[in-house]
């Protein structure tokens, strides 16, 4: 059963979450920086990597769309993160960065993004690509697992929230509305245990895998902060 959503957190999530659109993909992202008239959005690498011309449309909370570009100069190795930027004179809220290292199993978390599909009923679904802001979704849940070692692609925050295709790259927020992770893996992914290969190349035990596949997974914001510090060094 999902937890009730704090209205303040819901408002923050709506303001900082964007939809990233290209000819081939649709995903989500979160605004993490504003400098002069340039906004930087953090998302998943798998949201942006398959687009050939590397330009995107970003849908912001006011319903406007902006031309954005993938910052290919900032690479995160195998970690499934990417940055895109857009320029505008409009003013948008920037996410406040939380401390993912202080999360504990059982803590409330909220996951936001723009699902690609909407189930009309058990037999019929509709694409949300042209829905605009109406497609936005915010789910509540709890931290379910914090393994000592991350997955090969940086995922290390398991949570009970339901996320859907298209919500990849969207924010995971703590109870104060601070950014603690980036959505990226939904529950019971295709590919089985191989999807959960650990950073050292090993696979989890069958018992651990069964717990992992029953959760959604995010990359902790602390992982991003460490990578950015390393790149700037």
Language-model-detected regions and their locations in the chain:
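Flexible, gly/ser-rich surface segments that form the specificity/activation loops bordering the active-site cleft
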Residues: 93-155, 163-167, 183-196
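A structural micro-motif recognizing beta-strand termini
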Residues: 21-23, 44-46, 84-91, 97-100, ...
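Short, solvent-exposed secondary-structure boundary/capping segments
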Residues: 78-83, 151-160
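C-terminal cap/linker of serine protease catalytic domains
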Residues: 2-10, 115-117, 121, 130-134, ...
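Terminal peptide-recognition signature
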Residues: 16, 20, 29, 39-43, ...
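Short conserved beta-strand and strand-loop elements enriched in small hydrophobics
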Residues: 18-20, 54-63, 109-112
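Protease-domain processing segments flanking chymotrypsin-fold serine proteases, especially trypsin-like
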Residues: 1-32
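Catalytic-histidine neighborhood of serine endopeptidases
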Residues: 2, 26, 33-79, 89, ...
């Amino acid at each position: 059963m999902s937890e009730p959503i704090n209205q303040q957190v819901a408002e923050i999530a709506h303001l900082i979450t964007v939809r990233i659109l290209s000819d081939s993909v649709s995903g989500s992202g979160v605004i993490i920086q504003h400098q002069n008239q340039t906004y930087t959005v953090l998302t998943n690498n798998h949201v942006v990597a398959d687009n050939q011309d590397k330009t995107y449309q970003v849908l912001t909370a006011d319903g406007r769309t902006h031309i954005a570009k993938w910052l290919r100069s900032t690479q995160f190795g195998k970690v499934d993160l990417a940055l895109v930027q857009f320029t505008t004179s409009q003013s948008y809220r920037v996410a406040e960065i939380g401390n993912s290292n202080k999360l504990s199993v059982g803590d409330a978390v909220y996951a936001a993004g723009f699902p690609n599909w909407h189930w009309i009923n058990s037999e019929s679904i509709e694409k949300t690509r042209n829905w605009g802001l109406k497609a936005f979704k915010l789910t509540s849940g709890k931290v379910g697992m914090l393994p000592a070692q991350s997955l090969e692609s940086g995922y290390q925050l398991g949570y009970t929230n339901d996320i859907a295709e298209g919500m990849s790259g969207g924010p995971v927020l703590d109870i104060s509305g601070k950014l603690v992770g980036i959505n990226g893996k939904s529950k019971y992914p295709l590919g089985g245990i191989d999807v959960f290969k650990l950073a050292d190349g090993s696979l989890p035990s069958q018992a651990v895998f069964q717990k992992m596949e029953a959760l959604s997974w995010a990359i902790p914001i602390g992982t991003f902060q460490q990578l950015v510090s390393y790149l700037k060094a």
